[in-house]
């Protein structure tokens, strides 16, 4: 599980619903993630609210009684922000704001806000601003009037903060301008990718906060920002990496997440092009997270959406040093054994059977456990792709064993 440091941030409550399609257990998983998203954005979750419903209320998302209960809690406890786990319609957000006098955000808005904080380059900031404008355009009529007296804080950051006004025409013009700006930069990025020469391209993909940047640093000996927060990496980092005299390009891409806003998928076209144009994907998984299989499914869904699901892929199960599983007492005859009771070896057997023994690696990027095995597998796969793609390349690569012998001789000297 993700560990949080104690900081006095905005007092926030988070809200979700249990439906026929979303069990209480699944809601808890989503709210755990939403709480960490809130922490990453600068909020401290002090209370959770949930309600069982067949479907969301089209007017206020929750039932009238639950809305009143939340409103009373907000008034009595000085809550500044409410975050709903599902995306609210513009009318739902407007109706809730009429009843509860605080910032009303949803999961999409929160993720956009985090991206706004994390954007370092001009290009990333432009992408985020476009996503924010597209999201906020249908919500302008009620949202900004209600929030104008609540300056700053969660949900109010980013490049688009000062530009967004209640005039829809101005925002539409801004969207058109940003799209044109991104189109120009995309062409430049495509040209740059085309000029990288005859080298195999490898992309690190995976759920957010699974250790991709740590792995990037360990493999590429580069200095990529690493932090135990969601979306610590936003701008794509590309490094030339050499393993055993074999050079290739390694890119560390933005982490995926469940319920990833479509606005971000559309806006971050060039970032995702690093994945689309890769010859090999290293799908990094935090096996110590209790929901890691759901995370794999979420990543695979996005890879399918961007037409990259059929690329050669190595599953890299990271953080094996932190893996823990549930146990059942010997005299407990009632508890049913599930995948949450699997040992690490059982997971190894499961995934090696599922994707092939050579395509499932179990490592710890932090303490370098099984790291040489990982480097060897990457080397062998990249070398095979290189020989296939560039059969007439004059640069000859030694066999792996020869390279090891040569490296050992150099070390002895």
UniProtKB/Swiss-Prot annotation:
Residues annotated as binding Mg(2+): 213, 233
CDD domains (UniProt xref): HflX
Binding site for GTP: 206-213, 231-235, 252-255, 318-321, 364-366
Subcellular compartments: Cytoplasm
PROSITE patterns (alphabetical): G_HFLX
Source domain of life: Bacteria
Pfam families attached to this UniProt entry: GTP-bdg_M (PF16360), GTP-bdg_N (PF13167), MMR_HSR1 (PF01926)
Domain Hflx-type G as annotated: residue spans: 200-386
Record's keyword annotation contains Secreted: no
Keywords associated with the record: Cytoplasm, GTP-binding, Magnesium, Metal-binding, Nucleotide-binding
GO CC field: cytoplasm
Cofactor(s), by name: Mg(2+)
Transmembrane segments: none
Recorded GO MF terms: GTP binding; GTPase activity; metal ion binding; ribosome binding
Keyword set includes GTP-binding: yes
Family: Belongs to the TRAFAC class OBG-HflX-like GTPase superfamily. HflX GTPase family.
Protein's job: GTPase that associates with the 50S ribosomal subunit and may have a role during protein synthesis or ribosome biogenesis.
HAMAP family tied to this protein: GTPase_HflX
Subunit structure: Monomer. Associates with the 50S ribosomal subunit.
Entry protein name: GTPase HflX
Source species: Flavobacterium psychrophilum (strain ATCC 49511 / DSM 21280 / CIP 103535 / JIP02/86)
Lineage, highest ranks first: Bacteria, Pseudomonadati, Bacteroidota, Flavobacteriia, Flavobacteriales
Gene of this entry: hflX
